Amino acid sequence: MDTKHFLPLDFSTQVNSSSLNSPTGRGSMAVPSLHPSLGPGIGSPLGSPGQLHSPISTLSSPINGMGPPFSVISSPMGPHSMSVPTTPTLGFGTGSPQLNSPMNPVSSTEDIKPPLGLNGVLKVPAHPSGNMASFTKHICAICGDRSSGKHYGVYSCEGCKGFFKRTVRKDLTYTCRDNKDCLIDKRQRNRCQYCRYQKCLAMGMKREAVQEERQRGKDRNENEVESTSSANEDMPVEKILEAELAVEPKTETYVEANMGLNPSSPNDPVTNICQAADKQLFTLVEWAKRIPHFSELPLDDQVILLRAGWNELLIASFSHRSIAVKDGILLATGLHVHRNSAHSAGVGAIFDRVLTELVSKMRDMQMDKTELGCLRAIVLFNPDSKGLSNPAEVEALREKVYASLEAYCKHKYPEQPGRFAKLLLRLPALRSIGLKCLEHLFFFKLIGDTPIDTFLMEMLEAPHQAT
């Protein structure tokens, strides 16, 4: 059934208006589909919400599943493996004058020196003993310090690794003041750079490995810059932030007053919340039209998406607006609802969930307006909304928001590699709370105790009639 016929005239007119069409980007970006596990139970709130044993179970549109957003999370700790050879070599065999003790092949790492002239590199036996192989993995083949792993083909410490890398990258040339046979050990490795570098080569460090590493890093950085730039051009976070700022009431219009104490407002906090929601539904349409590419969708699809996500979109807004409020929420009308008022009105449980699962988490991570706008855009572009003419197009727009948000987090908060995932983890709570709020609203509508204005009533009634 065509859901737009259930919208009031104002709603359809606002959605159809072209005066506020958002600027659009061009081109598209394919977001890699990675699927790191975020632990059991994380994805379930965003999957199928299940059957609600309440009157709200008949509301199909607002409670469609969002689909898991985690498929695009690139875990910073993805699977890596390191191949460790079972027969490492020191680079000098038993024929070396430095390893000629019959009692102990390596009596002291300080005795290891490069051979005179360094014209040839002698090899250790092809199959050293197990103890010897284990030992060489834990010491630096150049200076005898603790090895941090295999670098450029040789087990070495961070100091010798860095020295060799700098020498190769800067193409440095050294000279020896003695006879080119200086002792290179942990204490004296910095005394002669020439002999240290020659020993790196003698032990098997490869210059080409440094150059390949540098090229790989350069290619990776160029790809990241290109990817970030492409994502932001397609779904610019600046436009999403502009949409948030355009519809958010100015701070000075807020009135710091409890619901029950404000003589100009009803004593019932539920009534005030419903009235505030009704007013915000008008601005919600204006906000959506400012989100890039939303106005390019078919009009029917725009209506479907707004109907499916209006409750979560409004909850996200007033939750973020309430970050500075203690034990309460701040409505767009400027009214402050304290948790005591909510408990006295019988909605304390859901109110406490808003405070602990949304407001508190947003406050702790200091979620900014751009991040809030991106999360709301993710909610808006819900490809699982019933009745969409082209769900794939909506899903592509959602993935563009994911990409832009991830790029924004990496750029703005480089010291917080897990911030993008932490933001997405607020969506399950938002979905669950949104469903519970719909149950409450539908119950209030049925019993008729709470005045529900026309726009909000239309949102509640239309999906019910369409099912």
From Swiss-Prot:
* Residue positions, PTM N6-acetyllysine: K150
Residues recorded as binding Zn(2+) 1, renumbered to this chain, are C140, C143, C157, C160
Identify the keywords attached in UniProt to this record, alphabetized. Acetylation, Cytoplasm, DNA-binding, Isopeptide bond, Metal-binding, Mitochondrion, Nucleus, Phosphoprotein, Receptor, Transcription, Transcription regulation, Ubl conjugation, Zinc, Zinc-finger
Compartment(s) where it occurs, according to its Swiss-Prot or TrEMBL record: Nucleus; Cytoplasm; Mitochondrion
A single Gene Ontology MF term assigned here is: sequence-specific DNA binding
Chain spans, region Required for nuclear export: 353-373
| Reported effect, S22A | Loss of constituitive phosphorylation. No effect on RXRA transcriptional activity
Briefly describe its induction.
Down-regulated by infection with viruses, such as VSV, HSV-1 and MHV68. Down-regulated by aging.
Looking up PROSITE patterns in the UniProt record yields: NR_LBD, NUCLEAR_REC_DBD_1, NUCLEAR_REC_DBD_2
Tissue spec: Expressed in macrophages (at protein level).
Give positions of region: Disordered.
Answer: 1-112, 211-233
**Where does this protein bind DNA?**
140-205
Q: Which residues carry this modification: Phosphothreonine?
A: T87
Query: What name does UniProt use for this protein?
Result: Retinoic acid receptor RXR-alpha
In its UniProt entry, the species of origin is given as Mus musculus
* Underlying gene: Rxra
